């Protein structure tokens, strides 16, 4: 338990930040699920549209520190590679 005023304030801040981060991570997962669903349906056009919507979200979360920048880049790269494979 926090004993000082500073520690109590930090605990409050951490709780609020954790909730915000969880919400934003959930949003990222939702966008990625839409891309994955389009890929599973082998629908190139839908997958491309979903990917174009997911990329800025991934970039924003990487900038905010919700996701590591390398993880965001890796996910974008793998999704793009999979989508390009739908044409082959």
Curated annotation (Swiss-Prot):
Q: Which InterPro entries match?
A: Ribosomal_bS20 (IPR002583), Ribosomal_bS20_sf (IPR036510)
Mention one GO biological process in which this protein takes part, according to its record.
translation
Give the span(s) annotated as Disordered.
1-26
Q: Which GO terms describe its molecular function?
A: small ribosomal subunit rRNA binding; structural constituent of ribosome
Cellular component terms, GO, for this chain's entry? Answer: cytosol; small ribosomal subunit
The record's keywords, sorted A to Z, are:
Ribonucleoprotein, Ribosomal protein, RNA-binding, rRNA-binding
Gene3D superfamilies linked: Ribosomal protein S20
Q: Which SUPFAM superfamilies match?
A: Ribosomal protein S20
Start-end of Basic residues biased regions: 7-19
Q: What family does this chain come from, according to its entry? A: Belongs to the bacterial ribosomal protein bS20 family.
What function does this protein fulfil? Binds directly to 16S ribosomal RNA.
Q: Which HAMAP family match?
A: Ribosomal_bS20
What NCBIfam families does the record tag this protein with? S20
| Record's protein name | Small ribosomal subunit protein bS20
Q: Tell me the organism.
A: Psychrobacter cryohalolentis (strain ATCC BAA-1226 / DSM 17306 / VKM B-2378 / K5)
């Amino acid at each position: 338990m926090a004993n000082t005023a500073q520690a109590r304030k930090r605990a409050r801040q951490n709780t609020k930040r954790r909730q915000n981060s969880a919400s934003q991570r959930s949003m990222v997962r939702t966008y990625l699920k839409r891309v994955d669903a389009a890929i599973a349906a082998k629908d190139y056009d839908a997958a491309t549209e979903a990917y174009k919507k997911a990329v800025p979200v991934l970039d924003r979360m990487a900038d905010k520190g919700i996701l590591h920048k390398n993880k965001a880049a890796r996910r974008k790269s793998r999704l793009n590679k999979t989508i390009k494979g739908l044409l082959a």
